[in-house]
From Swiss-Prot:
It comes from Lactiplantibacillus plantarum (strain ATCC BAA-793 / NCIMB 8826 / WCFS1). This is UPF0342 protein lp_1415. Gene3D superfamilies: YheA/YmcA-like. Belongs to the UPF0342 family. InterPro entries: Com_YlbF, YheA/YmcA-like_dom_sf. It comes from the Bacteria. It holds the Pfam family Com_YlbF. HAMAP family: UPF0342.
Length: 114
């Protein structure tokens, strides 16, 4: 019997949506979106993170001003309860996904350990 791994992945995607971690993240995100200033700050923070990450991937040096701007924005984000809650829920979901990744990659790990 042939296994269609993409069917399995699609099933996993559907089941992930039903986990406590994902549902809590969605509630936290929806709650944050109701606070216009928190949502705007969150979007700004995401944009800065993406820009800095892109520069690093391109091998470009970050300027002191860019690093300072990121730190200042992170400080502001850390003072908003809705965003702090969202980030906590993101960590929980990320832990679940890391656990799943370890399970999924077991065959590759076993291959290289022998």
């Amino acid at each position: 019997m042939a296994v269609n791994i993409y069917d399995t992945a699609n099933q996993l995607e559907q089941e992930l949506r039903q986990t406590k971690e994902f549902k809590e993240l969605k509630v936290a995100y929806d709650t944050m979106k109701t606070n216009d200033s928190a949502f705007s700050l969150f979007k700004d923070f995401q944009e800065v993170q993406m820009q800095l990450s892109q520069k690093q991937m391109n091998g470009e040096e970050l300027t002191d001003d860019e690093v300072q701007k990121a730190h200042d924005l992170a400080d502001k984000v850390g003072n908003v309860d809705e965003i702090k809650s969202l980030m906590g829920k993101e960590r929980n979901l990320n832990q679940l996904m890391n656990d799943l990744n370890q399970i999924i990659t077991k065959p590759v790990q076993a291959l290289y350990q022998n």
